[in-house]
Amino acid sequence: MKENKKAILEILKKKSKKDGKFENLVLNLALQKIDSDSFEFDGDAVYTNDKKRLVYCMSQEASFAIPEGVEIIGEMAFRGKKALKNIIIANSVKEIEHDAFYDCDELDNVYVPAGVKVVKSYAF
């Protein structure tokens, strides 16, 4: 299991356009907390294996659409994404956790559907 976690971390590091200390810290914590068989990476973000929780976004794009099926935007999932300007939250999302979009200074346009029932403190 340890080798599997290390291999996944290496893949995520290579996919990251900026290999910053914060991203490495978040990825290491995610790998320690979550069994490696419990999440997947689609090239832009890390999700739980059932794709109901967005754990961490690695995209450096100005716009991001959270895919349908995601129910929870995880704590610090988008934290520090300086280039992020537009976010479209899928209708399936029910909860936005603490600090999910913290330090996204350029975030200008957010679509939050009516189905979002919980927005925890400091989410934005």
Please give the residue ranges for each predicted region.
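Structural signature of tandem-repeat unit edges
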Residues: 1-47, 52, 57-72, 81-95, ...
